[in-house]
């Protein structure tokens, strides 16, 4: 049996749902945490009944994952994907700096489309892509950043607004995921 529940942003409601599934003897419980820093009580509950607990999308803090023998996280490595994006920018810049640096000031003026506000992947992807580019010797200047909540349609609307406001001042568009990048390109 597969049951899907929504916590509607409530950590308490989410805990109650996990508690119910553990009490019903489910083979495993998968959780998209409301608050990634507050998983320990769920881990302890599942551990006490030896029910595997699989977290996805929001990675619990490391200490919570290590609390149990059957606690897992499934997701991307946000740092690595950000480094890869930064390295792609560096490769493009090395191949054609004059095309990217439209105004020739030696600084890439950028805008960034970010995922969900406060989401660890948003924070890590934003920080690590910038760090990778700057560590690669390219100077950056932020023109603007907006939350598009991982959505292509929102990214498209934000990008249209930026183009209307800033036009050719934008030399680089950074996005926290592929869907928002597609929206920016639309």
Could you describe each region identified by the protein language model?
Residues 1-186:
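A residue-level marker of the well-folded mature domains of exported/periplasmic proteins
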